[in-house]
Amino acid sequence: MRPSSRAALSALALVIVSTVSVEAQRTSPVALDLREDIEQVEKKLIDLARAIPEEKYSWRPSPGVRSVGEVLLHISADNYLMPSAIGFPADAASGVKGDDYNTALAFEKKTMNKAAMIAELERSFAYLKKHLSDTPASKMAQPVSMFGMSITGQKAWILTTTHLHEHLGQLIAYARSNGVVPPWS
C-alpha cells in the first residue's frame, strides 16, 4: 500500500472513530423529553409556591405529614440528591450528597422563609436540568445504584420525573385545601 493511501485510510478511520465517540456522548432523546416535562412541572411548582400565602407554608393536612414548606424543601433536596446518586458531582452549596440520604433529610429541616424556599427550588431545578442535559445517551443504559436498587440511568431519571409529578399533585391538593386555585387552572 502506498504511503498516501495509508494516510488517507488512517484519516478516514480517525473520522469514523471520532464520529462514533461524539454520537455516544450526545444527549439521549429520552433525556430531552424528560427535560421538557421537568420544565413544565418546574413552572407549575414555582407558580404554585408563589400563589400559596407564606402563612400557609406551615400548614399540613394532618400530624406527621409534610407541611407545604417541607414539601418544597423535600423537592429541592431530591433535585440535588438524584443527579448526585446518578454519578454527577454533588452540589456543594446544598450539602446534599447522593451517597448519603441523611444529607437530604438534613436539607429538608432547614428553616427558610417563602422567598428563600422559592429561590432554593429554582436553584435546585437549574442543577437538576443541567445534569439531565449532561447525561450522554451512552450512560442511560448503564446501571446505577439508587436507594439500594440497581437500575439504569434512564430509569433513575424517569423516577426523578415521576417524583416531581407526585409532589406537584400533593401541593395542588394542599393549595386547594387552603382556598388557593393553581394559577394555570
Each predicted region: which residue ranges?
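Bacterial N-terminal signal peptides that target proteins for export
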Residues: 1-10
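Bacterial N-terminal signal peptides
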Residues: 10-19
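Sec/Tat signal peptide C-region and signal peptidase I cleavage site
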Residues: 20-24
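Acidic/histidine-rich, surface-exposed loop or edge segments in extracytoplasmic proteins
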Residues: 25-28, 96-110
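Short, contiguous alpha-helical
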Residues: 35-46, 56-102, 143-185
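Acidic/histidine-rich alpha-helical segments that form the ligand environment
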Residues: 105-143, 152-163
